[in-house]
Curated annotation (Swiss-Prot):
An accessory protein needed during the final step in the assembly of 30S ribosomal subunit, possibly for assembly of the head region. Essential for efficient processing of 16S rRNA. May be needed both before and after RbfA during the maturation of 16S rRNA. It has affinity for free ribosomal 30S subunits but not for 70S ribosomes. GO terms for cellular component: cytoplasm; ribosome. Belongs to the RimM family. Binds ribosomal protein uS19. GO terms for biological process: ribosomal small subunit biogenesis; rRNA processing. PANTHER family: RIBOSOME MATURATION FACTOR RIMM (PTHR33692:SF1). Residues 95-174 form the PRC barrel domain. It is found in: Cytoplasm. This is Ribosome maturation factor RimM.
Amino acid sequence: MSEKDFVQVAKLGKTVGLKGYVKLHNLSDFSSQFKKDATFFIKNTKEMLKIKHYNASNSTVLFENYEDIEKAKELTNLILFQSIEKSRQTCKLKKDEFFYFDILECEVFEEDKRLGKVVDILETGASYLFEIQSDEKWVEKKYPKIFFIPYLDKFVKNIDIEKRQIFCTQDAFLILENS
């Protein structure tokens, strides 16, 4: 499996108490994946961590083989990864919800005009913004290389994950023009 097959799900913080618990900073929208016996990968290693206990109320986690404070200190600042395949199995989406990794790299269209592709998703307080890398033909015409489309019904009509396409309203090209 390549790095593209994995997604960041959490960052581990400082130790809490003397028994090996560490603070877990959830980087996903799915806290349900952090439960007893769940396993995660550590970046740039083949090591897997298995949860022995997770306390949701204070976001602390205890991993097998790290059950004392000195051993647990080794985990501070590590990033936990989950395979995309396992994320699909354990994280249930509601209607019209999508995984970030499914949205990234989708082509963005307004009618038959290809505007560009999604390169990042930013969270604002109220909604999400799709960061779009403009299609080369728009850059050649002196439009910006990057622009943002809010993930709101007013701008996004349809997302087709299978075709990796996002269809926007007429206001999307207006955003590109005025960026």
